[in-house]
Design a protein with these regions (language model features):
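Conserved pre-motif I regulatory segment
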Residues: 1-45
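Proline-centered helix-kink/hinge sites
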Residues: 24-26, 33-34, 59, 78-80, ...
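Conserved helicase ATPase motor motifs in RecA-like P-loop NTPase domains
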Residues: 27, 45-50, 74-79
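Residues that scaffold the ATP/ADP-binding catalytic core of kinase and kinase-like folds
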Residues: 34-35, 63, 85, 135
Length: 138
């Protein structure tokens, strides 16, 4: 199986080709088609380094409504480091997806800067639980 077989649009396929991805990993083969075609949750388990971020991130990018400039997905991360890594990966996957805005929100960074970024039309928010809760309360 190759990535073009699992239902991703051409912009995403071009971005993952740039990253050197040729064939989906087992977790990606199972998760991506399911998440693209279903409106249900998925719980999956895989070892470190098996492509879990792409397994959930690529379908998120595929399904985002670009013309809706408001939050559509929140990805919660246990640490600031993982939040930044997932944001970097998502930005790489969305390299050719015009007008998609991904914002990282986490403690230890200026909250006003993060609020401005969110107010500018972020569709995907990647954040730590504490900062996400703080922002919701505001």
């Amino acid at each position: 199986m190759i990535f073009s077989d699992i239902g991703l649009n051409k912009n995403i396929q071009k971005a993952i080709k740039d990253l050197g991805f040729t064939e989906p990993t087992p977790i990606q083969q199972e998760a991506i088609p399911y998440l693209i075609s279903e409106e249900k949750d998925l719980i999956a388990l895989a070892q470190t380094g098996t492509g879990k971020t792409a397994a959930f991130g690529l379908p998120i990018i595929e399904k985002i409504e670009i013309d809706r400039r408001l939050p559509q997905t929140i990805i919660l991360c246990p640490t600031r480091e993982l939040c930044l890594q997932i944001t970097k990966d998502m930005d790489s996957y969305a390299k050719y997806t015009k007008d998609l805005k991904i914002t990282a929100v986490y403690g230890g960074a200026n909250i006003q800067t993060q609020i401005r970024a969110l107010n500018s039309g972020s569709q995907i928010i990647v954040g730590t639980p504490g900062r996400v809760i703080d922002l919701i309360k505001r």
